[in-house]
A protein has these predicted regions:
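Short, contiguous acidic/charged loop-to-helix segments that flank catalytic cores in large enzymes
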Residues: 28, 287-309, 334-342, 363-369, ...
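Conserved S-adenosyl-L-methionine
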Residues: 174-278, 283-293, 298-302, 333-334, ...
């Protein structure tokens, strides 16, 4: 009897193959450590491949005399790798019992040989994890298959982005805070358009805001060299992830001397940024002591943000860093829109100072780490009428000083990964199109308030509503009850009620019959 043909194997992507290989670490490494194990190895492979390509180019152009000259690598932003740091050496020893120590040594020597990587790579990490040698070797084999030189398909970016998102997804709520979904970062970049100047993120996580901003500039044929990047990150392991993420993509950034708390150890005290993008921790409690940071210059002109919640501490930190024409896009939990007490006083002052440009409520389930509803705030230091040239395009901004644009995106988004959703390119284009039309001259022809989607509110309207920034207090929502055909609805209810009464009579008759047959007739 002929053997039945086996079902064809489902092809899996390179990213999926790597994820499966990383998942083999289960039992040897805590899931929360996967990202550090995998991404550090991936960085090592990438750095080595780039080094070998540069070494070959130097040899062909100048001869063997200069192949070990560090300057010939640095001029092209290539990290110089001592022999024991090269991927070929790691793979030659992949099955050895001391491979973890060799990986640690490789990373240590790379960092020492390249000052730009100071503080970026894990220190004595693999030896401390005691990973099963066979599982580590299997992971090395998978990473070895990657062609990191495939620039056309952005292999570097694809793998790094995929892993960061998968790790955040796997870790779920309460963890993975370092990752902001790409569609949200893209929306912020497309709204504030960081083409030229200083870009700052006060809580930069793994650097996603920077990466997508550079992609935005590239996609619009801008010059990445015109954008200077500054960031700060509190968690040391995430700080290292960010440095690696940016280094892999050839993005230069000033992330401060160390991982540090933005509030108590500001690494960029005198910075004035043209663009700020941020996704601060939501509703962070006890972010300062009762008597701490009382006279901090970042609060000048405002109340001191309460210790119970850092939301307005983040807002005022951002405001203090904006340049004369600076614009910021950042995310906060919805509670910040309507908090009372000190927060209300600060919010009112922000509105009176003409800083709030747009408030955009996002759909639920965009984030892997929380299911709470989130708001995108756009602040603008200069809402006056002016003409500017951005990336070769002349824009004529109208005066928007006593106006705020409210948008509600809760009906947008498409299913993505389990129960999550994402804002599609079409969704984002609709949102940014409305926002940019509203900002510019001639908006009377290009912008209009749309029920359940957007509304341009005056200062007086906002003041009348007690300076709340909840979009639903301004955007018109259709009362669907008004659209009901009363006669048709009543006839439907009449029919349903008749059916229920008939069924009730039948049930009563059946019950009386049963009792009568048992000899216990019920007289009504």
């Amino acid at each position: 009897m002929a053997r039945a043909a086996s079902a064809p194997k489902k092809e899996i992507s390179m990213e999926e193959a790597l994820w499966k290989s990383a998942d083999k670490l289960r039992g040897s490494v805590e899931p929360a450590e996967y990202k550090h194990v995998v991404l550090s190895l991936f960085f090592l492979k990438f750095a080595s491949d780039k080094f070998e390509a540069q070494r070959k180019a130097i040899s062909e152009k100048y001869g063997e005399k200069f192949v070990d000259n560090v300057a010939f690598y640095a001029k092209d932003n290539v990290f110089f790798l001592p022999e024991i740091s090269r991927w070929s050496f790691i793979m030659e020893n992949a099955k050895q019992d001391d491979i973890a120590l060799k990986i640690d040594t490789a990373l240590y020597t790379i960092e020492k040989a390249n000052p730009a990587l100071k503080g970026a790579l894990p220190d004595n990490y693999y030896s401390r994890l005691h990973i099963d040698t066979a599982k580590l070797a299997s992971l090395l084999d998978e990473i070895d298959k990657i062609n990191t030189g495939d620039k056309e398909n952005d292999i570097i970016g694809r793998v790094y982005e995929y892993f960061l998102s998968k790790f955040a997804l796997a870790e779920g709520k309460g963890k993975g805070e370092f990752y902001t979904p790409k569609c949200i970062v893209n929306l912020i970049a497309e709204m504030i358009e960081p083409y030229d100047g200083i870009l700052y993120d006060p809580c930069c996580g793994s650097g996603g805001m920077f990466v997508q901003s550079m992609k935005f500039v590239e996609a619009h044929h801008g010059n990445k060299k015109k954008v200077s990047i500054y960031g700060q990150e509190y968690t040391n392991t995430t700080y290292k992830l960010c440095k690696m993420n940016l280094a892999i993509r050839g993005i230069s950034a000033n992330l401060g001397e160390m991982a540090a708390n933005t509030f108590t150890n500001d690494q960029h005290k005198d910075l004035k940024a043209d663009y700020i993008m941020a996704n601060p921790p939501f509703n962070q409690k006890e972010w300062r002591g009762d008597n701490e940071l009382i006279d901090d210059p970042r609060w000048d002109g405002y109340e001191v943000p309460p210790t119970s919640n850092a939301n307005y501490g983040w807002i005022l930190n951002i405001v203090s860093k904006l340049s004369q024409n600076g614009v910021a896009g950042f995310l906060l939990a919805n509670g910040a829109l309507s908090d009372d007490g000190t927060e209300l006083k600060i919010r009112r002052q922000l509105i009176e100072n003409n800083l709030v440009e747009a408030i955009i409520i996002l759909p639920r389930n965009l984030f892997y780490t929380t299911d709470i509803s989130v708001t995108l705030w756009i602040l603008n230091k200069n809402k006056k009428a002016r003409v500017v040239e951005e990336n070769g395009e002349v824009k004529r901004f109208r005066n928007r000083e006593r106006e705020i644009l409210f948008m509600d995106l809760r009906q947008m988004g498409s299913p993505y990964e389990k129960k999550y959703i994402e804002l599609t390119e079409e969704d984002r284009a609709k949102v940014t199109g409305v926002y940019h039309a509203w900002q510019q001259e001639g908006y009377e022809e290009t912008y209009q308030n749309v029920p359940e989607f957007c509304y341009s509110a005056s200062f007086d309207e906002v003041a009348e509503k007690g300076f709340t920034l909840v979009p639903s207090r301004y955007i018109e929502f259709v009362n669907r009850d008004e659209n009901i055909d009363f006669d048709t609805k009543m006839k439907t209810l009449q029919s349903e009620l008749r059916d229920l009464l008939v069924a009730e009579e039948k049930s009563k008759a059946d019950l009386l019959t049963v009792f009568k047959e048992l000899g216990y007739e019920i007289e009504l």
